[in-house]
Each structure stands twice: as structure tokens, then as C-alpha cells.
Design a protein with these regions (language model features):
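N-proximal, solvent-exposed amphipathic alpha-helical segments enriched in charged/polar residues
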Residues: 1-43
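Extended, charge-rich low-complexity interaction segments
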Residues: 104-114
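A short amphipathic beta-strand at an alpha->beta junction
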Residues: 68-101
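Generic "edge-of-domain/loop-turn" microfeature
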Residues: 38, 57, 86-88
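A short interface-forming secondary-structure element
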Residues: 41-68
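Hydrophobic beta-strand residues in large extracellular and virion-surface proteins
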Residues: 31, 48, 79-82
Length: 114
């Protein structure tokens, strides 16, 4: 089984090679492989999570078909778009305490300027 970090890097490399414009947009996002385990069927499913800043939301979703095509070609089930801005600015979010590294990564994504 390949690691999630390796799959993320492979996805990023493929996007940059096949769709350079989408690669530029995704360089302003945080891309991560998310795992879903369904206990009943004892199966793991992997999703592509794209955390984006609100100022490029429409640019990211513009390349949805290209992103989904490559994600499916490497065995991922679905592509999920998540607003990093909303997560970082949510006053009741426990992410900063529970996973400070992810919170810092998302904060970095939100503060970038295009």
C-alpha cells in the first residue's frame, strides 16, 4: 500500500504535468489524501481533500473535471473541496488545539496572496 503522502505528491506531479494552469492554482491550496473507513464493509476509501482560500474558490472549482479525472486515475474515490478560510476563522473550531500542525498549514494557505 502506498502512503498518503506519496499519493498526494504523485497527484500534484500529474496535475502540474498534464494541467499546468490547475497546478499553479493548486499551489495556493493545501492538498491532502483523506481516509474514510466503513466498519460494516471493513473497507477503506481514500478521498482527495483540497483546502482552498476563499479568494480563489471559483478558480479551484473551474478545474474540477481535470482534478477529478486525475484523482480517479490514481484510485481515489472523490474530490472534496474545503474552505480553509472558514476553518481557520471558525471561533468554535477545536482544530488549533487538536491538530496544531494542520491548523498552521491552513493558516498559511489563507494568508497567501495571489
Amino acid at each position: 500500500m502506498l502512503s498518503r503522502e506519496y499519493l498526494t505528491q504523485e497527484f500534484t506531479d500529474l496535475i502540474q504535468k498534464l494541467y499546468p494552469e490547475a497546478g499553479i492554482i493548486l499551489s495556493y491550496c493545501y492538498v491532502k489524501i483523506l481516509e474514510c473507513y466503513i466498519e460494516r464493509s471493513k473497507k477503506k476509501f481514500y478521498y482527495l481533500g483540497i483546502y482552498y482560500p476563499d479568494n480563489i474558490q471559483f478558480k479551484v472549482k473551474e478545474y474540477h473535471n481535470s482534478i477529478k479525472e486525475i484523482a480517479e486515475s490514481i484510485g481515489l474515490v472523490e474530490v472534496v473541496y474545503i474552505s480553509a478560510t472558514k476553518i481557520v476563522r471558525d471561533p468554535v473550531s477545536r482544530l488549533k488545539k487538536d491538530n496544531p500542525r494542520l491548523w498552521l498549514e491552513l493558516y498559511w494557505v489563507v494568508t497567501q496572496r495571489i
